Regions:
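Sec-dependent signal peptide recognition
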Residues: 1-10
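Hydrophobic h-region of N-terminal signal peptides that target proteins for export
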Residues: 10-18
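Carbohydrate-active catalytic/glycan-binding domains of CAZyme proteins
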Residues: 18-375
Length: 375
């Protein structure tokens, strides 16, 4: 009887391990350890001391406004995730930048070894102002799970021209006025956008910052990459040594190209950037850019997506490229399938990135096992 009881106890203890999932199923419900669909949209992943931490927007049933904040999940294997709580809570205080009901999107977290702090940046729109604010916001924490302390928000790099502009470039942009263009999308208007029409317009107040990601380069320098200039141009802005301020140095990617949802990684000395076009919540074809320097110049290549519905990025939109720890050259493409009428039911697309002729390929798989793909 004693042996039988011991065996039963062993089996009960072993059940959680036996029930662990091994596969990622893109586009399907993804339960956490408690059986609840993971609620971390537009997010990114940080690896720290043996764990992956997944941060994302908490979505409600009927609104995309932030009613909770930024959630955090933790995993060792990229498949089984445990809910760690709300890492950054929106506030009840009326008039707060992050008042409940604001728009809080695409949170990303990086670790700053100089300060020992975890630093979160996100796109913020003030409650009741639609998408007019176009702010970048920052918060810090002592632990990866938070709580994160909100610091500030605002436009980016006021009174600063792009770092690679010549005096002639600055002089040209300084003559541009939005009032001179009564109609958008004309050839003269497009030329003016490329020359810095909106850079000049927002010179005093700072550059617009919407869809965004963060990237820490091999030398430890951190960068904030975001959609700016009325979502017409991406900007790459250098962060301070503590990762909580912009230094005033920034560069532009694909001026006038209408790119958002940036996701970046580096492989064998070359930077790769996946973006989307600007079609609201609706999916469109992914775009691929590459450069030997984070600061450019960037070259656009065909979409990296292959398989059913590849022309619409499998129904999703890029959010982050996840480097697999301990596996050089192994990356996961992360995207969201948005469902604006039922935001909480939005789904995730996670797919391994392969390389063909040294160019990234994101091929659809109904399901896949990370430990097999990245063995």
């Amino acid at each position: 009887m004693k042996h039988l009881c011991s065996l039963l106890c062993f089996l009960l203890l072993a059940l959680p391990a036996l029930s662990k999932e091994r596969t990622i199923k893109p586009g399907q419900i993804w339960p956490d350890a408690a059986g609840n669909h993971i609620n971390a949209h537009g997010g990114g992943v940080l690896f720290h001391k043996g764990y992956y931490y997944w941060y994302g927007e908490h979505k409600a049933e009927k609104t995309s406004s932030a009613l909770v904040g930024v959630t955090c999940y933790r995993s060792k294997d990229l498949v089984n995730w445990t809910y760690c709580g709300v890492a950054l809570q929106v506030e009840d205080q009326v008039g707060s930048d992050i008042e409940k009901g604001c728009t809080l999107e695409r949170p990303k977290v990086i670790y700053c070894p100089r300060t020992g702090k975890f630093v979160m940046w996100f796109h913020l729109e003030l409650k009741g102002h639609g998408y007019a604010a176009a702010r970048a916001a920052v918060a810090v924490a002592d632990k990866p799970t938070g709580p994160f302390l909100y610091l500030r928000s605002g436009r980016v790099n006021p009174y600063c021209w792009p770092a690679d502009w010549s005096e002639a470039d600055r002089a040209c942009a300084d003559t541009l006025q939005t009032a001179h263009f009564g109609q958008w999308w004309t050839e003269p208007w497009r030329k003016a956008v490329a020359q810095g029409l909106f850079v000049k317009r927002d010179f005093n107040g700072g550059q617009m910052a919407r869809d965004m990601t963060l990237y820490v380069d091999d030398d430890g320098r951190a960068y904030h990459i975001f959609s700016s200039e009325e979502n017409l141009t991406l900007q790459v802005a250098e962060l301070s040594d503590d990762f909580t301020y912009h230094t005033g140095r920034y560069w532009r990617i694909a001026p006038g190209g209408q790119n958002e949802a940036p996701a970046i990684f580096k492989h064998e000395g070359r930077y790769w950037l996946i973006t989307s076009g600007c079609t609201g919540w609706d999916p469109n074809e992914a775009r691929l850019f590459t450069s030997k320097s984070l600061l450019g110049p960037w070259e656009q290549l065909p979409s990296p997506c292959v398989g059913p519905n590849a022309k619409l990025t499998f129904g999703g939109q890029s959010t982050f490229i996840l480097p697999v720890q301990g596996k050089p050259g192994a990356f996961i493409f992360m995207a969201d399938i948005w469902r604006p009428k039922h935001p909480i039911d939005a789904r995730y697309i996670w797919l391994p990135i392969t390389f063909k002729d040294n160019v990234p390929v994101v091929e659809w798989r109904d399901e896949w096992v990370p430990e097999e793909v990245f063995e």
